[in-house]
Amino acid sequence: MPSITLLHAGFYSSIQDRGRKSHRHIGIPHSGAMDQSSADLGNSLLNNALDAAVMEIILQGGTYLFSHSTRIAVTGAKASIRINNILVDQNKVLEISAGDLLKMGATSSGNFIYLVIAGGFLTDTILGSKAVYHNITKKNKTNDAPEM
């Protein structure tokens, strides 16, 4: 199974989608991406369903190693994005080869960076969403599950 290995964590990252819209009456918040238009842009660029899971990265990105070839998009807040130490543009499709290293720096404008992968992140769906909400979704720490 293709995976992304987290080599260095940024400030805070989580998996998000369009959220849980019908569970507030039982105390479950909407959740979902904080900048839905940026998440949608990444999914659209990759021809993913708009509700495909994305990684939401707050303020400071990390370093990620790809095990297989794929396509990604990085949208949202402006930041330094490098693949194999080569600066790349945001808001476009980026081709990734097995063994490529993605490094995201701190944001220079905005708060939320979105890492979007072709097909979306494969995570559990709970109450109709893949969005992280710590009271109902699995709690992982970097050393518990360094591969995604």
Stretch-by-stretch model annotation:
Residues M1-M148:
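Conserved "landmark" site that anchors the functional core of diverse proteins
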